[in-house]
């Protein structure tokens, strides 16, 4: 409702007359709204508060005000993101924030050559299987690090292939790529972009890419932003799954990563860059035309 928006969002930053003119409503109507029974406004506010708390819980306590505000109509209410932000503060809830520290999983001190950067930080794609982004991260456990290799389709942000291992051997990256190929059956010409790590520069990886007609692309040395979309994916995984959680065994971590990728990230988690839908929903909508 426009009157509620004026009261909650505009009245403290401009005059009522100016706010009413901007939203094409009358000041007299606004003042009548303010005199309406307090109970009705309170009921609406409580409904919004309940919806905000519910959506935050359903998102695994991950979503911030913008995504929660976008999801409110699903529960039959609406509110500006600033109102949602205030409600979150009042209830002591907030989105998880990412940590900036990241250990090195790139082993670039090898004798293999490096391929040129074919993307130049341009991750935009006009369809599926144009640009695949690849990288390796780690998940700490009481049994030692578990390494996770992933392949993302830049078009939909879908994780099309992934693999886990207790070592940084090239096998973990190759298995993720094989999963991606099996799932997508891509045409020849896909750009496979990664860092310069030995897992991607080795002969085994180059042969696999050649077998499937893929063009190899690598970030420049020391430029993590050349693969920023994958770096962002790993930061999201760490924020939502790893930080503040202790995995006692490799198996426990494997199961948690599987659930995060295949159930949460792919099918449920909404992405602002995809129009606030999940990767799976984005691809389904594209197929439906």
Where are these regions (language model features)?
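Charged DNA-binding/catalytic regions of mobile-element recombinases
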Residues: 1-289
């Amino acid at each position: 409702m426009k009157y509620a928006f004026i009261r909650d969002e505009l009245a403290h930053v401009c005059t009522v007359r100016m706010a009413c003119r901007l939203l094409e409503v009358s000041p007299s109507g606004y003042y009548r709204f303010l005199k309406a029974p307090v109970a009705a406004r309170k009921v609406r506010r409580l409904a919004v508060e309940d919806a905000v708390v519910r959506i935050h819980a359903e998102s695994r306590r991950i979503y911030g005000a913008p995504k929660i505000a976008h999801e409110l109509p699903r529960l039959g209410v609406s509110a500006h993101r600033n109102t949602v932000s205030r409600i979150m503060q009042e209830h002591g809830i907030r989105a998880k924030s990412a940590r900036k520290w990241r250990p090195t999983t790139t082993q670039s001190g090898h004798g293999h050559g490096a391929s040129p950067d074919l993307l130049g930080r341009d991750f935009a794609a006009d369809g599926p299987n144009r640009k695949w982004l690849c990288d390796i991260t780690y998940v700490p456990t009481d049994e030692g690090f578990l390494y996770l290799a992933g392949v993302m389709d830049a078009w939909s942000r879908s994780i099309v292939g992934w693999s886990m291992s207790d070592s940084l051997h090239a096998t973990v990256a190759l298995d993720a790529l094989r999963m991606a190929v099996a799932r997508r059956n891509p045409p020849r010409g896909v750009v496979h972009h990664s860092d310069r790590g030995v897992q991607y520069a080795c002969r085994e990886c180059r042969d696999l890419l050649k077998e499937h007609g893929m063009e190899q692309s690598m970030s420049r040395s020391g430029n993590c932003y050349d693969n920023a979309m994958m770096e962002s994916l790993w930061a999201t995984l760490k924020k939502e799954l790893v930080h503040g959680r202790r995995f006692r065994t490799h198996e426990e971590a494997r199961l948690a990563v599987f659930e995060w990728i295949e159930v949460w990230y792919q099918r449920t988690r909404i992405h602002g860059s995809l129009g606030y839908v999940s990767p799976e929903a984005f691809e389904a909508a594209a197929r439906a035309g």
